[in-house]
Amino acid sequence: MVRTRLAISVVLVSTLLLLNVKAKSVDPYKVLGVSKDAKQREIQKAFHKQSLKYHPDKNKDKGAQEKFAEINNAYEILSDEEKRKNYDLYGDEKGQPGFDSGFPGGNGGYSYSSSGGGFNFGGPGGWQNMGGGGGSKSFSFSFGGPSESSFGFGMDDIFSMFSGGSSKGKEQFGGFGSSSNAESKSKSSTVAAIKTINSQVYKKDVVDQGMTWLLLSYLPSQRGSQYHESIIEEVAESLQGALKVGRLNCETESSLCKQLGIVPRRAPRMFVYSYTSSGKATLAEYTEELVAKKVKSFCQEHLPRFSKKIDLNTFDVSAVSSQKTPKVLLLSTKKDTPVIWRVLSGLYNGRFVFYNTEVHDTSDPKIQKLGVDKFPAIVGWLSNGEKQVLKTGITVKNLKSAVQELGKLLEGLEKKNKKVSSKSQAGQAPNESSEKIPLLSRPNFDSICGENTPVCIIGAFRSSNGKEKLQSIMSKVSQKSLSRRQASTTGSQDTVSYSLLDATKQSAFLSSLDKSEFKTSSDKLLIAYKPRRGKFATFKGDMTIEEVEKFVAAVLNGDIQFTKTRQKPQIK
């Protein structure tokens, strides 16, 4: 029996030696097709191009799987500065001369890795498992390992592969290891920009921060995570300042994955954490081809959209400036809302009301009235109606610096607005109000009476006298503490808004609520409207400050019965 075991071991060792002699040392620079002074960006691009070409899921040629493994081994060396340095000096990423230079007796040695139906010889730190089909696994043997054996594993390990003998190799991985072991060694330097997400990080850095995230969910045993991460890195680099990236291990963070509704599959999954126009966070999965350009486009599509595009011909500046939150307007030659502005609208959502408009001619009287002489430009309004030209002829170095610089401009405007608001409150008598109730129009309707506002108190008038009466009453009532009660969820937006409506011009708006009730000779009426629920209630009492205040209080306390609208009301 001993002789039989010895004979088998001699045959196996001889075979391994023969294969190692035949295995040529592969130049990772040649594999990726880059020069020896190539920068990381060039290496990344070359890796993406080659990986896409030879990925086993797309390329069914016999040599594709082997070539794919070769490409991944090359990238593992060149993407790690320490391994690359060692390879340049010694021809081996571990800092030891390669096998071709003489059989080393210390730690290390390298010959290229290939993938097939059996074993995978070579590979610097365990077995690679990037891609590949048919459920096959690849193993690496490290020639020139520790003093225990020049092959990195003992004789017991050889026999345990066939007969389940010693478990030593399985526990310590000897000359063959698992994917999680191999990946953990290489990821620390190659994907440092990708943040590891756990429950605490998710709550602190991701939730309700206004920033869009590209998240990778994976299991350590899955194939392809390195390729996914290289794609994510490239996208993150091109969208720095607009996008943050993270990876979520659904094995160690199973509860968080379950909370997010992420179910692990055979391959890693990509999700974009973003915000809808209503402010609600969503998690959208990317399911298309793994190409950086397409992933980037997907991320851009899911950037915040809190800025409302307006037409300067119908933009009511007086209505905008009467609101309490500062307003900012971007004037640019772009048809679509610029990426920078969308990012800022997410980061500062709730602190500003964002608008943008497409412009081309600085000689336009409306542009000149705003005080803008160059595009792009940003104009702001304080809560007291004061206009501020924040910047004109804006130039930026890159997306990240642009978001930072323009963010500082917005924060400066916010500070001015706080000073103006505090002075206004300090100098205002208890029964005095300078609050001007805005007139509802198409540009300001969403910000005043959109779905983000729980209740709108609308004063409809048919004459100038009716308008003045409503303006006086509503401005005083709106300053009362109960009538200004804030939503507890945000603390930044009033539960109730106040506005005026020209009933002669907006008869369709009233008809959409109730076709018959508002056909009256009265020159003024008061309506409470709930946009989210599509319901309304009409004030029936005497039009006095006291009675209107009671009506608003009853609305907020839930003591008023609301009726379903005929259809969703719209402003002409």
From Swiss-Prot:
Ranges of residues in domain J: 27-91
Pfam families: DnaJ (PF00226)
Stored Gene3D superfamilies: DnaJ domain, Glutaredoxin
Keyword presence, Protein biosynthesis: no
Compositionally skewed regions (Polar residues) per UniProt: 422-432
Entry PTM: Not N-glycosylated.
Family matches, as PROSITE patterns: DNAJ_1 (PS00636), DNAJ_2 (PS50076)
InterPro entries: DnaJ_domain (IPR001623), DnaJ_domain_CS (IPR018253), ER_Co-chaperone (IPR052842), J_dom_sf (IPR036869), Thioredoxin-like_sf (IPR036249)
Coiled-coil regions listed in the entry: 394-423
Localization: Endoplasmic reticulum lumen
Biological process annotations from GO: cellular response to heat; pollen tube growth; response to heat
This protein's GO CC annotations: endoplasmic reticulum lumen; plasmodesma
Null allele phenotype: No visible phenotype under normal growth conditions (permissive temperature of 22 degrees Celsius), but mutant plants show gametophytic male sterility due to defect in pollen tube growth at temperature of 30 degrees Celsius.
Tissue: Expressed in roots, leaves, stems, flowers, mature pollen grains and growing pollen tubes.
Residue positions the entry lists as glycosylated: 431
Induction section of the entry: Induced by tunicamycin and heat shock. Induced by DTT and azetidine-2-carboxylate.
Any GO MF annotation of the entry: oxidoreductase activity
Keyword terms: Chaperone, Coiled coil, Endoplasmic reticulum, Glycoprotein, Signal
Region of interest (Disordered), ranges: 419-439
Major place of residence: endoplasmic reticulum
Subunit structure, interactors included: Interacts with BIP1 and BIP3. The interaction with BIP1 and BIP3 activates the ATPase enzyme activities of BIP1 and BIP3.
Role of this protein: Regulates protein folding in the endoplasmic reticulum (ER) lumen. Functions probably as a co-molecular chaperone that is required for normal growth of pollen tubes under high-temperature stress.
Stated name of the protein: DnaJ protein ERDJ3A
Annotated source species: Arabidopsis thaliana
